[in-house]
Regions:
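Helix-loop junctions at membrane interfaces in 12-TM secondary transporters
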Residues: 124-137, 147
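A late C-terminal transmembrane helix in Major Facilitator Superfamily
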Residues: 166-201
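Structural signature of the two symmetry-related core transmembrane helices
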Residues: 107-122
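Intracellular loop-helix junctions on the cytosolic face of multi-pass helical membrane proteins
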Residues: 1-65, 69-74, 220, 225-257
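Helix-to-loop junctions at the C-terminal end of transmembrane segments
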Residues: 91-105
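Loop-to-transmembrane helix entry
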Residues: 64, 70-88, 210-220
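A membrane-interface helix-boundary motif in multi-pass transporters
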Residues: 195-227
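Residue-level signature of mid-helix packing/kink "hotspots" within the transmembrane helices
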Residues: 86-94, 187
Length: 257
């Protein structure tokens, strides 16, 4: 039903844009074919970068629940883990806007990624220590706040840059493709957990997990986020649109007069 719901929403959603004669592709007014949108976006490197950032951001792993049950020995902690994940985000997001405005989307996100890496590696201090585990989660979530806050704004900048560069404004496709990459990443993450646990010899029917399985859980919890931090940092290195946003916005405004 969920895939059908997404398709129904997509099929019955129509974007309405005010256009003047001469707007569109090569001066053609009216509706722009979907193919022209994708052709324009394919040449927009910032679109590809934000897709990669969305994918990497959401390739987090759900290994925390396994660690709570099999490493910390308390499956009742799963609900508390959820709170430790959500509360920092709720508290921190209102502060992310001024931070991003002050230092820029890329720089604020880069700084946050350092915290994500530190928070992940913190688990190695003592993987079986409850407080170390929760501090790790909280530090990671605080670190990811700037990126979470910046990505939607980055997508908006990608739309503006695309219109400035090619004359094609693709709001709907840019934002929906970001959402799609997020969902694909979450699916890949879930599948990866199953593959890793299977390779480590995980057996849900056993009361005690093997040392190899426990090690796989801990290492996945730590190294998958660290690897994604490296990927996101590399993508952000090439994301220099922050420096061009004002110029792009100004020229677009002049064209629309």
């Amino acid at each position: 039903m969920i895939p059908f719901g997404y398709w129904f929403t997509f099929a019955n959603t129509h974007e309405i844009a005010s256009m003047k004669p001469g707007d569109g592709v090569d001066g053609r007014a009216g509706r722009i074919p979907v193919g022209d949108h994708f052709k324009a976006l394919a040449r927009n490197k910032y679109w590809w970068l934000t897709l990669g950032l969305n994918f990497a951001l959401w390739t987090y792993n759900g290994m925390a629940a396994y660690i709570a049950k099999y490493v910390l020995g308390n499956s009742n902690l799963i609900a508390v883990i959820g709170l430790a994940t959500v509360i920092p985000m709720v508290i921190g997001l209102p502060f992310a806007g001024p931070l991003v405005a002050r230092f820029g989307k890329r720089n604020a996100s880069m700084a946050g990624l350092v915290l994500v890496a530190v928070g992940s590696l913190l688990v190695f201090v003592d993987p079986s220590n409850l407080w170390v585990f929760f501090v790790s989660i909280i530090v990671r979530m605080v670190g990811i706040i700037p990126m979470n806050a910046a990505l939607n704004a980055m997508s908006g900048d990608v739309v503006e840059y695309g219109e400035w560069r090619s004359g094609v404004r693709s709001d709907g496709i840019v934002f929906s493709s970001s959402s799609f990459s997020m969902k694909v990443a979450m699916g890949v993450s879930s599948a990866a957990i199953a593959w890793i646990l299977g390779a480590s010899g995980y057996d849900g029917s056993l009361a005690v997990r093997s040392a190899a399985t426990v090690s796989a859980m801990v290492n996945t919890f730590v190294w998958v986020p660290v690897a994604m931090v490296v990927v996101m940092a590399a993508l952000l290195f090439f994301y220099d649109l922050d420096k061009r946003v004002d110029r792009v916005g100004g020229e677009l405004a002049a064209r629309r007069v």
